[in-house]
Amino acid sequence: MTTPTTLSGAILDPMLRADPVGPRITYYDDATGERIELSAVTLANWAAKTGNLLRDELAAGPASRVAILLPAHWQTAAVLFGVWWIGAQAILDDSPADVALCTADRLAEADAVVNSAAVAGEVAVLSLDPFGRPATGLPVGVTDYATAVRVHGDQIVPEHNPGPVLAGRSVEQILRDCAASAAARGLTAADRVLSTASWAGPDELVDGLLAILAAGASLVQVANPDPAMLQRRIATEKVTRVL
């Protein structure tokens, strides 16, 4: 069996084979009462649509640096796997980028990173609305992710020669990092992990998302956590590990 070329293929394809419809990411926001559950199929479809948007509309590819100015959120996971389907590199800091995906409150940061590159890049804003409503009041030239992504296909041709994935690391290096992170915590495919951790840096992203999914486990990600709800959520979501 050949190893998938992209990080998205290496992580998503085994999940799709093992259990395409079971929950892989369950997202809560205790401030709004939001709960969203994604299966492997749904996550892969959103990732493919995002990759097609990046490739076809925002001119991104395997040499591209894509700034991810987003919180730990189910849509962020889809965006990241979309970036990696096309072989581009996800940038989590304020270094120069060719494309930036951000929330509306981080537009100034996005403008700064794409305008510090040799050629001014593209910016897309995510509303992160659970019903897919668009971001409003955007400046001219800024793409609304929710509006743009829905017209793109949910299948994608993966990049055969991807560039660095994250922090200059290759697909193989990130997979080794994932394996080490999972082994250090004893994670297995039987685990359901509850986390309130951020994905702000490469190591946090590996520990808080990628290592969990690469191990075949599932993630319950909670934003604005209410401590009073923790024990009940552990029981109802059948959580086996808490980060």
Curated annotation (Swiss-Prot):
Q: What SUPFAM superfamilies does this protein's entry cite?
A: Acetyl-CoA synthetase-like
- What sections of the protein cross the membrane? none
InterPro entries linked = ANL_N_sf, Rv3268
User: What is the top-level taxon of the source organism?
Assistant: Bacteria
- What family does this belong to? Belongs to the TIGR03089 family.
Q: What's the protein name?
A: TIGR03089 family protein
Q: Which organism is it from?
A: Mycobacterium tuberculosis (strain ATCC 25618 / H37Rv)
